[in-house]
Amino acid sequence: MIIKNQLIFVNFYVILIIWWFVMGILDKIQKKSEKIEKEKKSETVIPSDTKLKPIEPHPTINKKATVGNDETILDTYSIKIDEIEMEVVIKREEGYIYYLVPEIDKINMSLSKLTKDHLNHIKSQISDLGLIEYDQIREYLTNFSMRYNLAIPYIDSLAKFFYLVIGRLGLLEVPLNDDRLEEVMVNGYNVPVFVFHRKHQMCETNIVLDRNEVDRIIESIANLVNRPIDSRVPMLDAFLPDGSRVNATTADITMNGATLTIRKFSKNPLTVIDLINFGTLDIDTAAFLWQAVEGYFGAKPANTLIAGGTGSGKTTLLNVLSLFSMYNERIITIEDTPELQIPHKHVIKMVTRPARPGMPEYEVTMDDLIKNALRMRPDRIFVGEVRGKEAHSLLVAMNTGHDGALAYDEPIYLSDGNIINIGEFVDKFFKKYKNSIKKEDNGFGWIDIGNENIYIKSFNKLSLIIEDKRILRVWRKKYSGKLIKITTKNRREITLTHDHPVYISKTGEVLEINAEMVKVGDYIYIPKNNTINLDEVIKVETVDYNGHIYDLTVEDNHTYIAGKNEGFAVSNCSGTLHANSADEAILRLTSPPMNVPKIMLTALNFIINQQRIRRAGKTIRRILGIVEIVKGGGEGHEFAKTTLYEYNGLKDSLERRGICMWEEEVCEIAGITKEELLRDRENRKKVLSYLYKNNIRKLENVSDYIMRYQVDPEKLLRSIR
């Protein structure tokens, strides 16, 4: 009886254990099922047939890179994206050029073996397990395929796909990491991505993104740059951390779906040697521009404007020319997109800032930056692109070059023999034209008085003689603070602001410096009859001042004679512009919204016209002409144009045309003959030829040779013979 009861108890205990074990398993299964269901609900589905959808109009582009009768392989190379590499094939077929990623075929075949549930589970697990390395993802996929008995044909390719999709921008990472590309363009949903290749130009890719993927990428970029983009703010314009510029739109304003355009920031910018290789310009023209931009060792740098249409390579040329600046100059760059890469030591890079919705004060325009840059004592200003009123500020900078002014009681010497205090002279016009006063951000007000035809004694820095020049503007602003007072051995005196330029002699050259840099013992230029002479500075002091300070704008020379006891000679930046010719550039500058007075264009030395043209079935970039702006063009004309270089389409080359007045001016200032200037240009051609023949084209290397020439030309020439 006891035994029977024990057996019954034992049986009951065994049944209880079995029941507990079974219920535990069922509970685990239920929890696992709930977890999977939760993952399915929270995870974004990535359908394999949308991200890599074949391109219907040209189905051959999704094939592997094989050459048929009607197709030609133009290029093949690999793109490294952190831990992985992706092959790229450039193919021409029936007049189209395609940028193909052959790995997409393998990825398609592998994804076709997976269901949406598989995809969701894989993504969830990779994220939850923190698998960020390619080898980790590959190992996980290998185990996954074995566990579920899946015949995945290309595990390596599938691992690359998930490596790019999770935490990155998907297959768009391939063109974004290709340094040979200038631009990546997503034109909407379920359409091919296009790219602009430096060598092969516009190409259609076999990368097609669906709505979810395009929106995800744009949202990721917006979060990265901390900028909104939605139905209320349907456009985004910002910079990626690497300097690339991104523009995005939502489907609210673009009919084919959201768009994305990324202008890539080049890690290896083109140099003058690259442009010579491309045929954009030749060695002779390059040597001329080197000499002009540098100004023959800084004697007279040329103010230069680059004009051209969209995609003509204006900014690339500007970056190339910027390398020719003297190695020790203070350079300020002003751009919408930070593209200029100048390897000099003393460079300040400034970028505009667009307004935000409801925050117009957040905007910083190019005009704002130019005006601010002028207060930063730059030797050079490079402006990325001129579109509006900043053109006026830029030309004012070229014409005046400073914010300095004189004290009220400083005499000025008019051409009719009258000597009058500058304050009295200027105040008269401020009273006469009180309704025509224009204001600048630096506090100055000014009035145009060119129609008054009042002439003043002016110092010609080239001929070193005194000339009669017309006063174009009068300037005035309120000031309280310290002024500089300079006294010479012959008792000449002048009191002016610290930043007003005067002229001293140094090693036989005319040197323009600010008043605060004048030292006792310097020899300063003074007028004597109708020529110029030197007087020794015996005293430089600061004095307190409270009242208005004054200045003039004088045509041509931009100098005038001012100061007590017969006075002193006192004084009064490159950019790109959308235009298809020098004439169109001038028309745009002098028309709304730029409205630059024609008289101010004489501050420009050269206009370079660069365009994108079609030749032998290819799009190429060429300098089509270099025009010089010279003062005076006959009666009723403020300036004249001389074509120095002109493109010959038959020969595909630039040919020298007219006589260059800048060459005459720089010879006068530098104290050299025309033969010496041309001999120096030949030497520069030797340097460029050496770099070209030896394929020395990297930015840092080309810049080093230019700097070495500027420091010691003969030493460099000996080293390359």
Curated annotation (Swiss-Prot):
What would be an example GO MF term here? ATP hydrolysis activity
What are the entry keywords?
ATP-binding, Autocatalytic cleavage, Membrane, Nucleotide-binding, Protein splicing, Transmembrane, Transmembrane helix
**GO terms for biological process?**
intein-mediated protein splicing
Q: Which InterPro entries match?
A: Hint_dom_C (IPR003586), Hint_dom_N (IPR003587), Hint_dom_sf (IPR036844), Intein_C (IPR030934), Intein_N (IPR006141), P-loop_NTPase (IPR027417), T2SS/T4SS_dom (IPR001482), T4SS_GSP_E_ATPase (IPR050921)
GO CC aspect terms: membrane
Q: Where are the transmembrane segments?
A: 6-26
Which PROSITE patterns does UniProt cross-reference here?
Answer: INTEIN_C_TER (PS50818), INTEIN_N_TER (PS50817)
Provide the record's note on post-translational modification: This protein undergoes a protein self splicing that involves a post-translational excision of the intervening region (intein) followed by peptide ligation.
State the annotated membrane topology for this chain.
Answer: Single-pass membrane protein
Which domain of life does the protein's organism represent? Archaea
Q: Where in the cell is it found?
A: Membrane
Q: Does the keyword NAD apply?
A: no
Glycoprotein as UniProt keyword: no
Annotated residues that bind ATP are located at G308, G309, T310, G311, S312, G313, K314, T315
Provide the leader sequence positions: none
Q: Its family? A: Belongs to the GSP E family.
The molecule here is called Uncharacterized protein MJ0781
Organism listed in the record: Methanocaldococcus jannaschii (strain ATCC 43067 / DSM 2661 / JAL-1 / JCM 10045 / NBRC 100440) (Methanococcus jannaschii)
Q: What is the lineage of its organism?
A: Archaea, Methanobacteriati, Methanobacteriota, Methanomada group, Methanococci
